[in-house]
Amino acid sequence: MDSASVPHRIPPEMPQYGEENHIFELMQNMLEQLLIHQPEDPIPFMIQHLHKDNDNVPRIVILGPPASGKTTIAMWLCKHLNSSLLTLENLVLNEFSLTATKAKRLYLQRKTIPSALLVQLIQERLAEEDCVKRGWILDGIPETREQALRIQTLGITPRHVIVLSAPDTVLIERNLGKRIDPQTGEIYHTTFDWPPESEIQNRLMVPEDISELETAQKLLEYHRNIVRVIPSYPKILKVISADQPCVDVFYQALTYVQSNHRTNAPFTPRVLLLGPVGSGKSLQAALLAQKYRLVNVCCGQLLKEAMADRTTFGELIQPFFEKEMAVLDSLLMKVLSQRLDQQDCIQKGWVLHGVPRDLDQAHLLNSLGYNPNRVFFLNVPFDSIMERLTLRRIDPVTGERYHLMYKPPPTMEILARLLQNPKDAEEQVKLKMDLSYRNSADLEQLYGSAITVNGDQDPYTVFEYIESGIINPLPKKIP
């Protein structure tokens, strides 16, 4: 870049490359690791960190009172995410660790081990290859604020913390029916989760310390400690109610651990709204443009502007409009390229609607480098679309727009003179809907990370869903 040439304009490909390859997050993670470990020679340390390629592996802590189901949820998450499960019991059973041997003796005597020894065990275990490569889930650790602070001091930072919660009366009752499979460690319940196989039923054992009094004492100790542990994990902690079916708890936990936290990475929204005619794309685009100062790029409007301005492309487009034919994709993309290449689109971002209508247009859009970083499908039932569009009317005298159901004219005189736009005729709408439905499956497959929104609700509710999808990072895809 020539220092004498001002102002500098950064090519749009540069921030797009950084965003697609998560360059900012990569640099942020390396800086965090440098500050935590403070190596004497940073360069080899950073190279080693890059070789590990484990910035996005699961690092999860699951906490909760006795009988909340945290071990079950942790085991299910481990199977789904292919991560390593760390519990107090399996940490002390590590046969290849002298620290674990010492901790095991203390654990057999007292059923607890000192915090310093526990944290040392965790540190040793997390350094092993399976935890480094595949990530880890801590079940029920840390139990106290002292343990939480010791873990943080060593630079062990979870990405997600889940706290299960349920009324004490429910937990006490649930704990009485708890049973354990001694071979697999799986936890069952006499009422809620009884195994169908008679072989497993016969070998189930009643765990120790599950009486009502003992459970109440454990709950009292848990409540005393958890209020001091929670402040150690601001912004990464989610409380989930355990007073619901275990499968529901699991899916809420899985959804949370697959989410990404917001970062300070530069982000220029490039939003694509897809959906059938009448799904509300234009309204949502206008709301986004108004609130976030995005450039509202409507494909149909661009074509009309090109004709009105009598540009070269406008003259080529005009015959298609006169004959009511679809504009050639090549012409369409040239008009669109001119608009998206302007500085306001590059600097502020854009919200595009009206294109692509099919897979060919989508591939053309991508080949030109206009890759959206947020794609939304607005789903609206066929009957709702017909109701929205076929009942629209316009007053030829005042130009006022009406809807026979949602915004009827105030007088019979006005009603009598209302006209319907030919494009809102039932047959025309059905043709457009049929075309949209035929192409939607291909577009959904192409835009795999797209977010589907129910468009058949209040427009501002729809806007809130779209807004949330733009502001928050996209969830991780677990293979």
Swiss-Prot record:
The catalysed reaction is:
AMP + ATP = 2 ADP; a 2'-deoxyribonucleoside 5'-diphosphate + ATP = a 2'-deoxyribonucleoside 5'-triphosphate + ADP; a ribonucleoside 5'-diphosphate + ATP = a ribonucleoside 5'-triphosphate + ADP
Q: Which Pfam families match?
A: ADK (PF00406)
Q: What InterPro entries does this protein's entry cite?
A: Adenylat/UMP-CMP_kin, ADK_active_lid_dom_sf, P-loop_NTPase
Keywords assigned by UniProt, alphabetized: ATP-binding, Cell projection, Cytoplasm, Cytoskeleton, Kinase, Nucleotide-binding, Transferase
For the protein in the UniProt heading, the enzyme class is transferase
Q: Where is the region Adenylate kinase 1?
A: 58-258
Asked if the Swiss-Prot or TrEMBL record annotates the protein with the keyword Nucleotide-binding, the reply is: yes
Enumerate the residues binding ATP 1. Answer: 67-72
Q: Which GO terms describe its molecular function?
A: (d)CMP kinase activity; adenylate kinase activity; ATP binding; nucleoside diphosphate kinase activity
Tell me which residues bind AMP 2.
325-327, 354-357, 361
Task: Cite the residue spans of the region called NMP 2.
Answer: 298-327
Which annotated residues bind AMP 1? 140-143, 147, 203
Entry's localization field: Cytoplasm, Cytosol; Cytoplasm, Cytoskeleton, Cilium axoneme
Name the segments for region: LID 2: 391-424
Give the span(s) annotated as NMP 1.
87-113
* Residues covered by region (LID 1): 177-206
Q: Which domain of life is it from?
A: Eukaryota
Q: What is its EC number?
A: 2.7.4.3, 2.7.4.6
Any one cellular-component term (Gene Ontology): cell projection
Q: Where is this region: Adenylate kinase 2?
A: 269-471
Binding positions for ATP 2 per the UniProt entry: 278-283, 392
Question: In UniProt terms, what function does this protein have?
Answer: Nucleoside monophosphate (NMP) kinase that catalyzes the reversible transfer of the terminal phosphate group between nucleoside triphosphates and monophosphates. Has highest activity toward AMP, and weaker activity toward dAMP, CMP and dCMP. Also displays broad nucleoside diphosphate kinase activity.
What is annotated about its quaternary structure and interactions?
Interacts with CFAP45 and CFAP52; CFAP45 and AK8 dimerization may create a cavity at the interface of the dimer that can accommodate AMP.
Q: Which family does it belong to?
A: Belongs to the adenylate kinase family.
Recorded protein name is Adenylate kinase 8
